[in-house]
C-alpha cells in the first residue's frame, strides 16, 4: 500500500518508461559489519542477483558476525556466494574438503572456484562432485589475476575452460577484472576496454551465464554503455549498487545520453 499521496516510486518508474528488470548485479561485501550489510539488504535486496561474501574477510571475522550477515541475506531472499580467493588457498593447502564443509555449515549457497593466482590440482569433475555432495552450487572465474590483459588466444582458451566448467554444473562464469579494471582481463594498462573480446564471451555463453567484474565506476559505466541493461556485473561494492542500477535504467545523466539505456518515452494520453 502506498504510504504517501501520489504515485509510489515503482509506479513513477513505470510512468517515465523505466522497465522492470530482473536482478543482474552481484555486489560484494568487502568486510562490512553485519548492521551495514543488513541495511544495504533492506534498501537493495530486490536489485541483487547473488551477494558475494568477498575475499577472506569472513573467515577471520568473528564467526557470529559472519553468520548474522548470512542470516540477513536469507531473510531478504538473497543467495550468497564466497569469493574465489579462499577456494584457491584451500586447494593449494590441500584442505578443500574442510573448506567446503565450512561453507556448507555456515549456510552459503554457492562457492566461487578459479585459478586466478594458483593452478588447480583437481579436475572440474572432482570439484563439482565434492561441492554437490555438500549441497553447494559453484561458479567459476575465468582469467589470471596477475596475467595482464587478455589476448584473443587467451580468450579462446578461457572460453574452452568455461565450457568445461559449465558441462559439470557451474551455474555462472565470471570474467576477471580484479579491483582495478586496469592491466587485467578485458582492460589494458590504461584501463581501455576491449569490446571485441568481451563480445566473444557473450557470444559463447550469453548474458544469463557470464558475469563481468566491474569494480569501479569507469568499468561499470563502460560495460553498461556497450552492452546495455542486460549485461550482468559483479564485484560491485555494496555502496555502489544503487549507482550501477540507476545507470542500468537510464536514470543517470550520462546513461540518459545512450539510446540503449535511456527509457523509452511513454506515449501521450
PLM regions: where:
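Conserved N-terminal beta1-alpha1 strand-loop-helix module at the mouth
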Residues: 1-70
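Active-site-adjacent beta->alpha loops and helix N-cap segments on the catalytic face
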Residues: 11-14, 35, 58-72, 89-98, ...
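Structural preference for beta-strand elements that scaffold enzyme active sites
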Residues: 21-27, 50-52, 77-81, 109-112, ...
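Active-site mouth loops of central-metabolism enzymes
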Residues: 21-36, 54-59, 81-95, 114, ...
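Catalytic beta/alpha-barrel core
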Residues: 28-29, 52-60, 88-90, 100, ...
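Glycine-rich phosphate-binding active-site loops on the catalytic face of alpha/beta enzymes
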Residues: 55, 106, 110-116, 162, ...
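Catalytic cores of alpha/beta
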Residues: 95-100, 153-166, 216-229
Amino acid at each position: 500500500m502506498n504510504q504517501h499521496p501520489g504515485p509510489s516510486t515503482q509506479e513513477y518508474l513505470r510512468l517515465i518508461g523505466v522497465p522492470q528488470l530482473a536482478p543482474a548485479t552481484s555486489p560484494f561485501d568487502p568486510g562490512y559489519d553485519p548492521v551495514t550489510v543488513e541495511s544495504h539488504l533492506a534498501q537493495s535486496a530486490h536489485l541483487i542477483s547473488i551477494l558475494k561474501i568477498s575475499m577472506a574477510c569472513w573467515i577471520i571475522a568473528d564467526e557470529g558476525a559472519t553468520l548474522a550477515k548470512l542470516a540477513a541475506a536469507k531473510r531478504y531472499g538473497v543467495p550468497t556466494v564466497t569469493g574465489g580467493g579462499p577456494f584457491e588457498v584451500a586447494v593449494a593447502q590441500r584442505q578443500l574438503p574442510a573448506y567446503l564443509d565450512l561453507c556448507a555449515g555456515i549456510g552459503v549457497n554457492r562457492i566461487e572456484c578459479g585459478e586466478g593466482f594458483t593452478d588447480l590440482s583437481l579436475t572440474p569433475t572432482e570439484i563439482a562432485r565434492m561441492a554437490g555432495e555438500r549441497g553447494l552450487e559453484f561458479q567459476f572465474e575465468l582469467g589470471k589475476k596477475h596475467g595482464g590483459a587478455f589476448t584473443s588466444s587467451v580468450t579462446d582458451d578461457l572460453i574452452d575452460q568455461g565450457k568445461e566448467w559449465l558441462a559439470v554444473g557451474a551455474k555462472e562464469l565470471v570474467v576477471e577484472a580484479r579491483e582495478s579494471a586496469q592491466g587485467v582481463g578485458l582492460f589494458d594498462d590504461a584501463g581501455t576496454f576491449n569490446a571485441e573480446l568481451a563480445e566473444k564471451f557473450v557470444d559463447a555463453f550469453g548474458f544469463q551465464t557470464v558475469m563481468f567484474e566491474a569494480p569501479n565506476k569507469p568499468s561499470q559505466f563502460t560495460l553498461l554503455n556497450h552492452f546495455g541493461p542486460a549485461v550482468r556485473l559483479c564485484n560491485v561494492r555494496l555502496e555502489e549498487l544503487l549507482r550501477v542500477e540507476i545507470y542500468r535504467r537510464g536514470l543517470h545523466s550520462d546513461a540518459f545520453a545512450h539510446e540503449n539505456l535511456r527509457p523509452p518515452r511513454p506515449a501521450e494520453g
